[in-house]
Design a protein with these regions (language model features):
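Generic helix N-cap/helix-start motif at coil->alpha-helix transitions
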Residues: 25-32, 59, 104, 152, ...
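Residue-level detector of the short coil/turn that links helix A to helix B
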Residues: 43, 126, 184, 218-219, ...
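Short coil/linker segments at helix-helix boundaries
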Residues: 39, 43-47, 66-230
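Alpha-helical repeat scaffolds
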Residues: 47-54, 83-98, 130-143, 181-195, ...
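Solenoid-like repeat scaffolds
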Residues: 26, 53-60, 101-102, 148, ...
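Alpha-helical adaptor scaffolds
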Residues: 208-216, 247-251, 375-385, 401-447
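Terminal, low-structured helical/coil segments at or just beyond the last alpha-helical repeat
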Residues: 231, 357-372, 380-384, 468-469, ...
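"A position-specific structural signal for the A-helix of alpha-solenoid helical repeats
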Residues: 34, 65, 69-72, 110, ...
Length: 496
């Protein structure tokens, strides 16, 4: 009798817990897959793939990590042939994941992650419509998972990111997002990313995304910079963190710190090649006026990069090296060939390529005045945070020395940004205000960017009325080459 009872008890236990056993079998973070994920997050793709090859191909976590590896390879190389060869894997992996245990909180997260991997890759290859549908479907999967498993932290890494993106949508388009079933705001997304930062699996990635949101959507503060430095120092063997740390610092006018991250980045055969690093190093040399060094870096980038993005931008910067490095007419002639190349190579998917193409088209048709060299040197130095050099270039000049309205607007904008970077907002305001006034009639990009910076200045002064007015003014500018990034930042500031 006791034996019978024991058997019934065992059978009952198995029936009760069988769904959890199946779930565990479908989505298992084995020690090997944990090591592989850690390696992938460091851009050590080959060692991760070797580790994954020892794991079951039926494991949903293995499928996710295989996809993660493909995403990293495609995103860092921009290789069109590789994209054509690998793109069918998205639907194959989704089909397999859909058949796995849908009572597991991991199933919808893994489906969403695969879709978001390919959305990111497709955007880089100019497939915007397909990428958009992947994002929409990923959002719905994550929203459903949140309802079913509200305390499951891995959901919130990507859901929080999407809520930030939705919160950046302009007011006159929010109805489209709502019609598609997309809801969320920036504060909600940031809170979710903060929560996901505590997750043992996705925590590191969530923290990195939060830094990128602060840098590319919001306003990156000195406090953010200190937290970023500490975060990167805690992971000295992580190439991905060093790379993104460098791009964030460069974006925010701290090129010396960006250079420090790249100089201290981990290297070796285990790490994925990043040709774009040569481009960043070239940028920093160009900002410093070290033209031979910049040329070497840009040429190395072109020799190793297989994609179509950043080509226009790189040839434009090679033009700048020769144009700014030789004030004689011979320098103008020698540099012209690089601008002609800008027109014929690459594509205009990214903003830097759009700006390069616009400059090349204008210069080749109309030429450039000597004053534009001065403004360009000041711009490059200021963008890198080398404000002493930037002021040295512009101090001998005043607005009156620039005959053309676009030059007058740019002079004022550059002076305003220099003082803003030197934490002298009171000195910056008159210059930025003048740049805005000069830019409005012709809708010059300097007006939009000046309005954005004035919004930030008044926000810092806690003058919300003026800040809001300037953010709205920034959005009102039409058809300039930086509209996407300016509008996103202005909308984000308005929605905070």
């Amino acid at each position: 009798m006791l034996t019978f009872i024991r058997r019934v008890a065992v059978a009952t236990t198995l029936l009760v817990f069988l769904p959890f056993v199946v779930s565990a079998q479908d989505f298992v973070w084995t020690p090997g897959l944990q090591r592989a994920f850690s390696d992938l997050q460091k851009l050590k793709v080959a060692p991760a793939q070797q580790q994954m090859a020892r794991e079951s191909t039926a494991n949903g976590i293995r499928i996710f990590l295989d996809d993660y590896a493909d995403m990293l390879l495609l995103a860092t190389s921009d290789d069109e042939q590789a994209f054509d060869r690998l793109s069918d894997r998205e639907s194959d992996r989704l089909d397999v994941l859909k058949k796995l245990d849908d009572t597991s909180p991991w199933q919808r997260v893994m489906l969403a992650e695969v879709r978001l991997h390919w959305a990111f890759v497709k955007l880089k290859f100019g497939k915007e419509v397909s990428a958009s549908w992947d994002v929409i479907r990923a959002y719905k999967l994550l929203a459903e998972n949140q309802k079913r498993f509200p305390n499951f932290l891995p959901t919130y890494k990507s859901l929080g990111t999407l809520h930030v993106m939705i919160g950046s949508v302009p007011d006159n388009y929010i109805w489209v997002a709502n019609l598609l079933g997309l809801h969320g705001n920036i504060k909600q997304g940031q809170d979710e990313l903060k929560g996901a930062g505590q997750d043992p699996v996705f925590g590191r990635e969530a923290r990195l995304i939060d830094f990128m949101v602060r840098a590319y959507v919001l306003k990156f503060t000195d406090a953010d910079e200190k937290l970023l430095q500490r975060f990167i120092s805690e992971h000295p063997d992580n190439l991905l963190l060093n790379f993104f740390g460098a791009t964030i610092e460069q974006k925010n006018g701290h090129s010396e710190q960006a250079l420090a991250y790249l100089a201290n980045r981990p290297t070796g055969k285990d790490y994925l090649a990043l040709p774009i690093i040569e481009n960043i190093l070239g940028d920093i040399s160009l900002q410093k006026g070290e033209y031979p060094s910049a040329i070497t870096h840009f040429q190395q980038f072109l020799a190793t990069y297989k994609g179509q993005n950043f080509l226009k931008d790189t040839y434009y910067k090679l033009f700048l090296c020769y144009w700014l490095g030789d004030d004689r007419s011979a320098g103008d002639i020698a540099s012209r060939a690089y601008l002609q190349k800008v027109i014929t190579v690459g594509r205009t998917t990214v903003e830097s390529d759009k700006a390069a193409h616009k400059f090349a088209d204008t210069y080749l048709k109309r030429g450039a005045s000597p004053n534009q060299k001065v403004l360009m040197r000041a711009r490059l130095a200021s963008d890198g945070g080398f404000t002493d050099s930037a002021l040295t270039y512009l101090r001998p000049y005043s607005e009156a020395k620039f005959p053309l309205t676009p030059e007058k607007a740019e002079y004022n904008y550059r002076m305003g940004r220099i003082f803003q970077r030197r934490n002298d907002s009171d000195a910056a305001i008159p210059y930025l205000s003048r740049a805005l006034t000069l830019s409005e009639p012709d809708q010059l990009s300097f007006g939009a960017t000046a309005a954005l910076q004035l919004g930030y200045i008044y926000k810092q002064k806690n003058d919300r009325t003026h800040a809001r007015s300037f953010f709205q003014k920034a959005i009102s500018f039409k058809r300039h080459e930086y509209k996407n990034s300016v509008d996103n930042k202005a909308r984000a500031a308005l929605n905070e």
